[in-house]
Amino acid sequence: MKIKLVIPDSQDHVSLVGRALKGILEENFPESEVLFLIELAVCEAVANCIKHAYADQGLNKVEVELEIGDSEIVIEVKDEGRKPDPCFMDRKEFQQSCNPESIQEGGRGIPIINQVMDHVDCYSFCKKNILVMKKKIPAQKT
């Protein structure tokens, strides 16, 4: 099954993507913790796309494609905005600090995505930036 959502590049629509994704996945997978983590990773990806690719302009669109296969879920977040830094996906760890005043507000999205998903890749093709996230799923009972 493959589903495509297209939203305006507004932070107001990030939660809509999360709710739609959760509703679709709940029909197929009962494990709520995994669903919550996938929803979190996708919402972080969409929010980052809006913030960094389009700089919150509100004039463009973000595409989210969900494909549910036999052994994995594949989610692609696509935009036509500014190309990301090639090294931005390398952030695996969260910022560690004992001083609350030195902790930055942002910068958690990529580490969350990398820790939640089994495979993450980012590339540009035909003027589109594409973030691919894959999560292995247990075999479905018939």
Pin down the residues of each PLM region.
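Glycine-rich phosphate-binding loop
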Residues: E101-M117
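Conserved short strand/loop->alpha-helix "switch" segment adjacent to the catalytic nucleotide/phosphoryl-transfer site
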Residues: L21-C43, S102-I103
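A short, flexible helix-to-loop-to-beta junction within the catalytic ATP-binding CA
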Residues: A53-G58
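A conserved short beta-strand within the histidine kinase catalytic ATPase domain
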Residues: N60-E67
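Glycine-rich nucleotide-binding loop
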Residues: K83, C126-V132, P138
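Glycine-rich/acidic phosphate-handling loop/turn and adjacent ATP-lid/helix
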Residues: I75-E105
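Glycine-rich ATP-binding loops of the HATPase_c
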Residues: D118-S124
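Short beta-strand-loop-beta element adjacent to the nucleotide/active-site pocket used for signaling
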Residues: E67-I75
